[in-house]
Amino acid sequence: IKGLHILLAEDNELNMEIAEFMLQNEGADVVKAWNGREAVEIFRKSEPGEFDVILMDIMMPVMNGYEATKMIRSLEREDAKVIPVIAMTANAFTEDRLKAKEAGMDEHIAKPVDPKLLVKVIYESVD
């Protein structure tokens, strides 16, 4: 995942630090959003194709990950429809996976995040 530009949406400071460290340790470039609305705004203002993947927490204040993903997917630009969006959540039940798919998310990673799995899922998503 070296050289990838990743939008990381996470409201918990410790989780953000851990995820950011894991990603930067693998050579990725990380832009942080602290809630769903911020993630949508950062993506909307970015150049088309600027981000390679979005890591989206589900439970966030202001706007949750499901709503944020739906808004990103509805933007009038090509990359909004195809950018991989990976849910990161403590809720790893089948029902949550279905909700993530319905919102337009491509993958689902359970917290606490396993670094090797995270890298594998990102790599497979952008491949």
Where are these regions (language model features)?
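C-terminal compact regulatory domains
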Residues: I1-D127
